Amino acid sequence: MATKPKTLQDAFYETLKDVYYAERQSVRALKKSAKAAEHEELRQAFETHAEESANQVERLQQVFEIIGKPARGKTCEAMQGLTAEMEEDLEDFEDGPAADAVLAACAQAVEHYEIARYGTLKTWASQLGYDDAAKLLYETLQEEKKADRLLSEIAERINVEGSDEDAEGGTTKSKGGRKAA
């Protein structure tokens, strides 16, 4: 059993391991999402960000080197929950704009988690005097924010398409916002 973190240095290392695991899971989830996406722009965004995420894993390995610790992950329960939710949603929704809208929403949930974690790690790295690590983490943070903005733009278009599909398909929405027969 690992000892509980007691210092900011310990918290930084434990969070870094958590994010390392999460980022590797993200690469797999993005590849799976790219295969599942029907909307071409969304598929391309997933493929591009999967490549970026692979580079981010390499960047995290550099951060481990900078702090003199082995690059190893620890199970990230948040990422496991987010990917499990994505899997469940993929099973629950049919193909088409609604499924793509759900994929985009799941991907954004991952991006928001990563933005929060990278922002924290970047700040802690600066406070701990790991300036080179802070620069690497800042670079990744900016990529995550850019990916989130792109997903937002794509999601707006997909959501409109999904709404149009609902209107054309003769389905209506109940007061709770869900489709009713």
Language model segments and positions:
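Amphipathic alpha-helical hairpins
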Residues: M1-A181
